[in-house]
Structure formats: C-alpha cells, structure tokens
Amino acid sequence: MPRPTGKKFDKRRQQQNPLFKRKKFCRFTAAGVEQIDYKDIDTLKDFIGENGKITPARLTGTKAHYQRQLDTAIKRARFLALMPYTDQHKA
C-alpha cells in the first residue's frame, strides 16, 4: 500500500509531529538583562527540570554567556538555601 502524499498530508503531519522544533531564542538577550541575579528565584526555577537538574542551553536556547551566569546563580541560590538541590521528596 503506498504512503499517502500531498499537500493535505504534509500539513497534518507537521502539526502532529511531537518533535516539531520551535525557533529558540535567549530570554535574557531579548529582555536586555546584563547580569543574572541569584535572588530572582522565579526566573531561575524556569531553568531547572523536574528532577532538580539545570536544563542545558541546547534545550532552552540560552546563549553561552548567560548560561554560565545562570549556572553560577543557581548554584549560589542553592548554597544559600534559596532553592532546593533536588526535587520534592516523597516521605
């Protein structure tokens, strides 16, 4: 049986593709941030996964300069007990 082809099929296939890549951009460059602050916990939480790991720049689209600052800010916030090192523990 031949595979379905045509304009309609291609459009539907693109919409259903779970790996469809959206154009990534650096949030910090767009906002004009010069320095990432370790006290801004709400921003830092966006860059930490469910398991407590720092999300890599290739997934978030953050530029290398800001990714290094982000890494340092998260580590400082963890050291000062502003953020947890791991996810929520189930007792």
From Swiss-Prot:
<dbReference type="GO" id="GO:0022627">
    <property type="term" value="C:cytosolic small ribosomal subunit"/>
</dbReference>
<dbReference type="InterPro" id="IPR036870">
    <property type="entry name" value="Ribosomal_bS18_sf"/>
</dbReference>
<keyword id="KW-0694">RNA-binding</keyword>
<comment type="similarity">
    <text>Belongs to the bacterial ribosomal protein bS18 family.</text>
</comment>
<keyword id="KW-0699">rRNA-binding</keyword>
<comment type="function">
    <text>Binds as a heterodimer with protein bS6 to the central domain of the 16S rRNA, where it helps stabilize the platform of the 30S subunit.</text>
</comment>
<protein>
    <recommendedName>
        <fullName>Small ribosomal subunit protein bS18</fullName>
    </recommendedName>
</protein>
<dbReference type="GO" id="GO:0070181">
    <property type="term" value="F:small ribosomal subunit rRNA binding"/>
</dbReference>
<dbReference type="InterPro" id="IPR001648">
    <property type="entry name" value="Ribosomal_bS18"/>
</dbReference>
<keyword id="KW-0687">Ribonucleoprotein</keyword>
<keyword id="KW-0689">Ribosomal protein</keyword>
<dbReference type="GO" id="GO:0003735">
    <property type="term" value="F:structural constituent of ribosome"/>
</dbReference>
<dbReference type="Pfam" id="PF01084">
    <property type="entry name" value="Ribosomal_S18"/>
</dbReference>
<dbReference type="InterPro" id="IPR018275">
    <property type="entry name" value="Ribosomal_bS18_CS"/>
</dbReference>
<dbReference type="GO" id="GO:0006412">
    <property type="term" value="P:translation"/>
</dbReference>
<comment type="subunit">
    <text>Part of the 30S ribosomal subunit. Forms a tight heterodimer with protein bS6.</text>
</comment>
